[in-house]
């Protein structure tokens, strides 16, 4: 069941990024193969886990399945975090300057992964790698100057500029 939940958890992004967890759960609930091969209770548990996987949900997942997928859905590396936050801000705000995009990315990463961030608080299993990544995020996002330098160096490696 965890594999199915993992496969479905972000499919709803094809429909709507903001409500992707709800859209993904709808897709899972309507999958004829799953309805044929799993009990209605199992389909319900899987759909709820898909709905509950978001770190920004504001509440604990309803099942162990939701906790597993939610915890596994965290960005595993600082590099992936830099890439996603920068690219998303650039896409969302194409008229902002490079420095404004970088600062928005820094703020987002801090809101999500700083010690009091919503994703930092919703890791349901002990994970030394995740904890080390959180410490690194705290270090690099503490000041705009440090973060900007790191992001610009990362972008040079990515884009060759």
What do these predicted regions represent?
Residues 20-24, 42, 64-70:
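Short acidic-hydrophobic sequence patches enriched in Asp/Glu that either
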Residues 19-35:
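An active-site-proximal "capping" alpha-helix that borders the catalytic cofactor pocket
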Residues 8, 57-161:
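Divalent metal-dependent phosphate-bond-processing catalytic cores, especially two-metal-ion Mg2+/Mn2+ enzymes
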Residues 33-40, 89:
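Inter-helical turn/loop segments and adjacent helix faces that build the functional surface
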Residues 1-16, 20-24, 45-55:
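His-Asp-centered metal-binding catalytic motifs of divalent-metal-dependent phosphohydrolases/nucleases
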Residues 25, 47, 102-106:
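Hydrophobic core segments within long, regular secondary-structure runs in both alpha-
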Residues 26-29, 48-51, 67-70, 76:
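A broadly conserved amphipathic alpha-helix scaffold signal in soluble, globular proteins
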């Amino acid at each position: 069941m965890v594999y199915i939940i993992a496969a479905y958890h972000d499919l709803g992004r094809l429909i709507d990024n903001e409500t992707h967890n709800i859209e993904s759960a709808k897709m899972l609930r309507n999958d004829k193969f799953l309805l044929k091969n799993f009990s209605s209770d199992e389909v319900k548990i899987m759909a709820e886990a898909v709905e509950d996987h978001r770190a920004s949900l504001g509440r604990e997942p309803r099942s162990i399945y939701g906790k597993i997928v939610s915890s596994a859905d965290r960005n595993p590396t600082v590099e992936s975090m830099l890439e996603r936050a920068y690219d998303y801000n650039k896409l969302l705000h194409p008229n902002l300057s490079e420095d404004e995009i970088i600062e928005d990315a820094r703020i987002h990463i801090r809101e999500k992964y700083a010690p009091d961030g919503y994703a930092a608080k919703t890791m349901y299993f002990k994970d030394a790698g995740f904890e080390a990544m959180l410490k690194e995020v705290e270090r690099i996002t503490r000041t705009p100057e440090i973060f900007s330098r790191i992001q610009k160096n990362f972008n040079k490696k990515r884009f060759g500029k």
